[in-house]
């Protein structure tokens, strides 16, 4: 087994960079590895139109390390009031690549999200017409639904309907966490894809709850039982082009995670491709990592793959105990623990 792994430079098809003083840190981490990234729009206030997307894009570009060619791919935040014309303007901009459906209350800064899919059907129709992908956080948020069942019920109540109503629409089922989602995406048309995070491949709810509550494993959608983890690993390492890399790296300051009511999100951007390599190596599937990380995503979005390469070496190193996050601190996933793969920084 080789101790070196060279891949076409990957892209991250789902990441949270936050804003303001955090950007120099989060942008440096993502730009270290990835050529492009789909940038989540759930700021306060959210990114609702092309003008706001461009302003956020400029802030990200200004935060890139010197010499970086990292390209942020911007996303609109759908609300009950999103108009078809806003979709058309965003598509015409050339820098907005998708729009995101957050069910209201589903995750961080989603209070302005969609309360009923019926209210955004004209906007979704416009997306289908202009060829803009719809990214969906696939969870119901009703109080009578168990948090571990939110994704499955969303499929039955909403996802099937959207796909049937708009057969030409490209839909990304974001950060899937269940065998049910794997089956749905596998059986759907070629216009339906899904992102999978490193933390959902490496961990299940036992890691978060057994022996004590570990807040830095808490994310939404929440970690599920190990049978779902196995289904995700099967999908990611299958070679099926419908599944591709999306870290959902979502930093929160240490005090906001280690709290009586802690925030949801795992910070993985500092070592994302290294974490995915561990997951794929567990399945003896390192030969499938390039497709998942570097080819399937751009193909789904109709973009060319990157042409430069990165190299990973099998070499133990210790993840930092903490990282700067503006004037605050973020605790990364696997803080203080050993990682098995390391990115060669000088690789081109």
From Swiss-Prot:
Active site: 248
Subunit-level organization: Homodimer.
A GO CC term assigned to this protein in UniProt: cytosol
Recorded superkingdom: Bacteria
Residues where Zn(2+) 1 binds: 14, 16, 100, 248
Cofactor: Zn(2+)
HAMAP family noted in UniProt: PyrC_classII (MF_00219)
GO BP, one annotated term: 'de novo' UMP biosynthetic process
Cofactor binding summary note: Binds 2 Zn(2+) ions per subunit.
GO molecular function: dihydroorotase activity; zinc ion binding
Pfam families, alphabetized: Amidohydro_1
Record: residues binding substrate: 16-18, 42, 137, 220, 252, 264
EC category: hydrolase
Reactions accelerated catalytically: (S)-dihydroorotate + H2O = N-carbamoyl-L-aspartate + H(+)
Name used for this protein in its record: Dihydroorotase
Source species: Pseudomonas fluorescens (strain SBW25)
Cleavable signal peptide: none
Protein function: Catalyzes the reversible cyclization of carbamoyl aspartate to dihydroorotate.
TM ranges: none
